[in-house]
From Swiss-Prot:
PROSITE patterns, alphabetized: ZN2_CY6_FUNGAL_2 (PS50048)
Segments of this protein annotated with the region Disordered: 44-93, 168-196
PANTHER family documented for this protein: MONODICTYPHENONE CLUSTER TRANSCRIPTION FACTOR-RELATED, OLEATE-ACTIVATED TRANSCRIPTION FACTOR 1-RELATED
A GO CC term assigned to this protein in UniProt: nucleus
Keyword Magnesium included in the entry's annotation: no
Organism taxonomic ancestry: Eukaryota, Fungi
Uses, biotech or industry: Phomoidrides A and B (also known as CP-225,917 and CP-263,114) are potent inhibitors of Ras farnesyltransferase and squalene synthase. CP-225,917 and CP-263,114 inhibit Ras farnesyl transferase from rat brain with IC(50) values of 6 uM and 20 uoM, respectively. CP-225,917 inhibits squalene synthase with an IC(50) value of 43 uM and CP-263,114 with an IC(50) of 160 uM.
Function: Transcription factor; part of the gene cluster that mediates the biosynthesis of the antihypercholesterolemic agents phomoidrides which are dimeric anhydrides. Probably regulates the expression of the genes from the cluster.
Subcellular localization(s) per the UniProt record: Nucleus
GO molecular function: DNA binding; DNA-binding transcription factor activity, RNA polymerase II-specific; zinc ion binding
Biased composition (Polar residues): 77-93, 168-183
Protein name as annotated: Transcription factor phiO
Domain of life of the source: Eukaryota
Source organism (scientific name): Fungal sp. (strain ATCC 74256)
């Protein structure tokens, strides 16, 4: 005959707090059995049994009276038998202190040490709860937590009248919609810390260091309605003089490098709309200013706070400069019947061979006027002077691009640095192809 497992006796917390003896084969609350826990009064755990009562001669009159009250309650529990965890009606008012614990095995602790006939006071019943459970900014979490507390109270006390005494019912619930357990959204609590909306990124060098660069964020105010190397830029959203007001005050960088470069390019784009795009003097002046600003950016500690994105931005500026030089120095639209933008989209080899075969000479006479004081230089003298000036500028631009490429290689290799390397290498190859074309 197999040995029977020990039966789960009465709950340890209730019996041990009241110092009652185990009812042996008649469990009282069956809390241990419902929670699938082993009762401390089991045969396998003899050390968890309650302590014996003191000697009869050491008892006082008060302790004798208290023992009689406990025996009366024990008899009432035995009369209930296996009626579950619902206490008898005459004992529901006697517990005066209900402690809520985090341990599911100790959800409620009945303290019979304080017997009073007054109403139950739940002022300290929820002392272990965190305030965020009561004033939670998420309505679903409040509804879930409040409904769970209500179910716990109803299952433990056997009555719904105690819900009105919970602190959550008067602080976090609306009395008109208590059945739906929703919050009053018209007046949120002052203690809630609502998330602040993210401010829009303004056009500034510091904002580019935060968000990934793209055409609409880097060039938000450049025209795109004309056919030129600047056609990839977006339309202007504000006047160039208002760029200083768009600076973010949240970051202390104090740098105007990006703003200066893009304002100058915007001014050049406005000039291009009026028919002055093909002038060599304007293009050379813009190239010199941009090259100087690029050198300033490379030596600026504020601009290089996020070096990878800065180098990517500078690479885009240098590529745009090469586009402008190709467009103004190699006017091949009439000779080849194909615009420079279509040729730039082809492969580098076919692009180089097409330029070698079909490009016309530099349009010196039609594009600009060269004056020395009041004397106008024309003909071959003008062509030789402009060729020398343009070659010198392109060599200086090539030196700047070498410095930029060295800075990219020394920076940490990320996706931005790899993209900057690709852009600057392609622009450098196109620049040297242009220099070879000018040399003849």
């Amino acid at each position: 005959m197999s040995e029977k497992p020990p039966k789960i006796r009465s709950t340890c917390d209730a019996c041990q707090a009241a110092k009652l003896r185990c009812s042996r084969d008649k469990p009282r609350c069956r809390r241990c059995q419902n929670l699938n826990k082993e009762c401390v009064y089991s045969v396998s755990r003899p050390l968890g049994r309650p302590r014996r009562a003191p000697a009869e001669e050491a008892r006082t009159d008060d302790s004798t009276q208290g023992e009689g009250d406990m025996r009366t309650r024990e008899s009432s529990f035995e009369a209930n038998g296996s009626s579950g965890n619902i206490p008898s009606p005459h004992l529901s008012a006697s517990p005066t202190n209900i402690m809520v614990h985090d341990d599911p095995c100790k959800s409620l602790v009945w303290d019979d040490a304080l017997d009073t006939d007054g109403p139950m006071d739940f002022g300290s019943t929820l002392s272990d709860f965190d305030t965020s459970m009561i004033l939670d900014p998420v309505p679903d979490l409040i509804t879930h937590a409040t409904s769970s507390s209500t179910d716990l109270a109803a299952s433990s006390w056997g009555t719904d009248s105690s819900i009105a005494t919970l602190p959550t019912s008067s602080q976090a619930l609306d009395t008109k919609s208590k059945s739906t357990m929703n919050l009053d959204k018209s007046a949120p609590p002052e203690s809630l810390s609502l998330p602040m909306p993210t401010p829009p990124l303004s056009f500034e060098g510091t904002s580019m260091l935060i968000s990934p660069p793209n055409e609409t964020e880097i060039f938000p105010f450049l025209q795109s309605s004309f056919e030129s190397p600047l056609s990839n830029f977006a339309a202007p959203t504000s006047a160039p003089t208002e760029l200083s007001s768009l600076r973010s005050n949240s970051l202390d960088y104090g740098c105007n490098c990006y703003t200066t470069v893009l304002r100058r390019m915007h001014q050049f784009s406005l000039t291009s709309l009026k028919g002055g795009l093909s002038t060599i003097d304007e293009t050379m002046r813009l190239e010199k200013e941009i090259r100087g600003e690029v050198i300033t950016i490379l030596h600026c500690s504020s601009c290089t706070a996020n070096r990878q994105r800065v180098l990517l931005f500078v690479g885009i500026i240098m590529e745009t400069t090469v586009d402008m030089l190709e467009h103004v120095l190699l006017d091949d639209t009439a000779a080849s019947g194909q615009s420079i933008f279509d040729q730039l989209s082809s492969s580098p080899q076919s692009h180089r061979s097409k330029r070698t075969r079909t490009l016309s000479p530099l349009p010196y006479g039609e594009k600009t006027t060269l004056r020395l004081g009041t004397y106008e230089i024309d003909g071959e003298e003008k062509a030789g002077f402009l060729s020398f000036m343009i070659r010198s500028r392109l060599k200086e631009l090539s030196t700047t691009m070498r410095h930029l490429h060295t800075a990219i290689q020394q920076a940490q290799q990320t996706s931005n640095s790899k993209a900057a390397t690709t852009i600057i290498v392609e622009a450098f190859q196109r620049l040297h192809s242009l220099m070879r074309r000018l040399d003849g």
